[in-house]
């Protein structure tokens, strides 16, 4: 059994979440898009699926993010759609939907400066957390 904070459900270890984010950091999106595109993105989603299969204990939060292009409400909606697209792809690969949850943060918590095109590209991403 897992912790009280996690309603008795087991959590994914910090090491597993770190590995998930290493793959997830390579899941980026074009501006105004939530489509899963590119061979590398698909390979990384398959690696994430394999990691979850190897570690049946614990659930995952998929966090969606956007760059500062567009207004705040639009960016929150877009970030949710990005996280949802990743959820749907993982489910298609065989991950049970009950192990996944989606949150959209819009342009909050940028990894890079939104003043540069490279920074905005990096900020259009998903990240993962163990569900507590």
Summary of predicted features, one role per range:
Residues 1-59:
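Periplasmic peptidoglycan-binding/tethering modules of Gram-negative envelope proteins
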Residues 39, 63-132:
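Periplasmic OmpA-like peptidoglycan-binding domain that tethers envelope proteins to the cell wall
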């Amino acid at each position: 059994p897992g912790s009280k904070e996690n309603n008795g459900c087991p959590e994914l270890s910090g090491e597993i979440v770190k590995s998930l984010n290493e793959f997830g950091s390579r899941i980026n999106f074009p501006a105004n898009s939530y489509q899963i595109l590119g061979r590398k993105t698909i390979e990384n989603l398959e690696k994430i699926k394999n990691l979850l299969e190897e570690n049946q204990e614990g659930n995952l939060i998929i966090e969606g993010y956007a760059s500062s292009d567009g207004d705040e409400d639009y960016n929150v909606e877009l970030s949710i759609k990005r996280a949802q697209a990743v959820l749907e792809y993982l489910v298609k690969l065989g991950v049970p939907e009950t192990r996944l949850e989606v949150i959209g943060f819009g342009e909050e918590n940028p990894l890079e400066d939104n003043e540069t095109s490279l920074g905005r590209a990096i900020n259009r991403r998903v990240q993962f957390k163990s569900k507590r």
